[in-house]
Amino acid sequence: MSGRNAQERWDAIYDQHRASGDPDPFVALSEFLPEPPATAVDLAGGTGGTALWLAANGYDTTLVDISPVALNVAEKEATEKKVSLTTICHDLESDEPLGSLWDIVVCCNFYDPDFFTQLHTCVVPGGIVFVRVATVTNLERHSKPSRKYLVESGELKDLLTGFEPLSHVEDWFDNRHEARIIGRREID
């Protein structure tokens, strides 16, 4: 899907949201989440439930999403909660690099194999990455997301080059089959 079409699609979806929602327990409850102070980014983070939680808990946090509508929801909630949140409107499927490094990188419910092979370029050496994406096994119970947005069994670990796996699980979570990886960026 081209950048403009993807943005319009996500803008229409997020136009129905008035609040950011809850943080992702995969991140918020993880024993591998470093203590603040640290920099953090939530990639394809939508309305920012996890990003706002990170910001409220002392992390210098950035939220990246293709949808300005989603980012506006997050910015309004950050203002209401009096937390500092940087937002960046960016298409992760584009060839443009983000141009920053973070201590913690979160990327959930987004799948682009080309992007994942370059994810290490966003993480400081020794930094932590949290990646969660539905697998093709999910199609056994659900027709969406469609096949092109799903990872094959074992594929995610292979795509995340430059990371030492701290945790890797592929299983059913709340009736959704996902691959979940927490990794530490290798020090060159």
Predicted regions and their residues:
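Conserved class I S-adenosyl-L-methionine
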Residues: M1-E35, P37-G46
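Conserved SAM-binding strand-loop segment of SAM-dependent methyltransferases
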Residues: K81-L92
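A short, conserved alpha-helix within the catalytic core of class I
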Residues: Y111-V123
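Conserved beta-strand signature within the Rossmann-like core of class I S-adenosyl-L-methionine
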Residues: G127-N138
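Core SAM-dependent methyltransferase catalytic element
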Residues: D171-D188
